[in-house]
Amino acid sequence: MNCVVCSGRATNRNYGAMSCFACKMFFHRTVYKNLLFRCKRIQNCTIHFKIFPKCRACRFQKCLIVGMTLAPLNDGIVSIGNQSDYSYAKLLDDLKFKNDKNYSHFVNFYSLEDPSLADILKDRGIMKLVKRTPKTLNDVDQWSIMMAYSRISYFLDFNFIRDLDSSDKNTLFKYNISRAGCLALAKCAFNENKPKLTFPNDVDAFPSEMYNLCGSSTAVLNQVSGQVIAKFVELKIKDEEYLLLILVMFCNPSISNDFSDKTKLALSSHQQAFCSALFRYCQINYSKSAPTRFTELLSLFGIVNKSVDNMNNLSMMLQFCEPKFQFKRIMQDLFSNSLL
């Protein structure tokens, strides 16, 4: 039998997965020494899993994906144990319930407040949500801040995320919220058969000032807006796959070298759990093609990263060329992300 990490010859079942001695010791050293690696190729080194993963970041990521773990999980919603059908089904039901509740708040409420990311992480009540009416203003500013707030609220509803150190939490959310928002809008556009990212009531995801800045080159905006949707269309991503993918993306311990040991361990163990659940879904629904489907789904992250990078660059250009134009404070925090 082959090692599920590197495809070499497996020696035994180590840390929950059939693996060779080298991968067993690599995983052991990485976890116990709290090592942190960074991939230079946006975590696409092992996208086909046909060659030995020389990139240590992707090698460790593969260890987590195939189920290697040293730490017990402490959050009920992802404690899926031995992947029994009951606990697996309960996980998906819980995620659907949380997502539906979150989306309902997103489309039915608005806020006139202008808090920073740190303000919201400290106290979500600072937003002072107001019920929408037919007379409520429909503009990109309102929808942008509500999208950011709804994504923040969604992730804060997980105990292990809410309990992270405040500094680590700020870094984690600052890096991920734009990506999570991009995925959420792309999923809605895919469901509604739309070619570009829009908020409810067909409000464009980009402010009119950005179209004015681009002039006749609006094709650039359309490309940025449509590239993630195109991947959704290509893969025909299901609701369950989307819900697990956003959590696999969010629980990435490698986005910062400054995370505490506690944060790295919490993110790694929960990312492994969500990866395992996603692979389980692929096994149930795609049978023998499950590994291929799984890697195709993970390839979405590279597209999202590229799209968010382009959005951030366009936003910075707009602020430079139009000094009087001001984004909401939380959007400024996300655009100024030094990790990008």
UniProtKB/Swiss-Prot annotation:
Superkingdom, taxonomy of origin: Eukaryota
Keywords from the UniProt entry: DNA-binding, Metal-binding, Nucleus, Receptor, Transcription, Transcription regulation, Zinc, Zinc-finger
Span of the signal peptide: none
DNA-binding stretch(es), residue numbering of this chain: 1-75
Domain NR LBD: 98-337
SMART domains in the cross-refs: HOLI, ZnF_C4
GO molecular function: DNA-binding transcription factor activity; RNA polymerase II cis-regulatory region sequence-specific DNA binding; zinc ion binding
InterPro entries named in the record: HNF4-like_DBD, NHR-like_dom_sf, Nucl_hrmn_rcpt_lig-bd, Znf_hrmn_rcpt, Znf_NHR/GATA
Entry GO terms, CC: nucleus
Matches recorded under SUPFAM superfamilies: Glucocorticoid receptor-like (DNA-binding domain), Nuclear receptor ligand-binding domain
Zinc finger annotations (NR C4-type) as residue ranges: 3-23, 39-58
Gene3D superfamilies per the UniProt record, alphabetical: Erythroid Transcription Factor GATA-1, subunit A, Retinoid X Receptor
Function in brief: Orphan nuclear receptor.
UniProt-recorded name of the protein: Nuclear hormone receptor family member nhr-197
Source organism: Caenorhabditis elegans
Lineage: Eukaryota, Metazoa, Ecdysozoa, Nematoda, Chromadorea
Gene name per UniProt: nhr-197
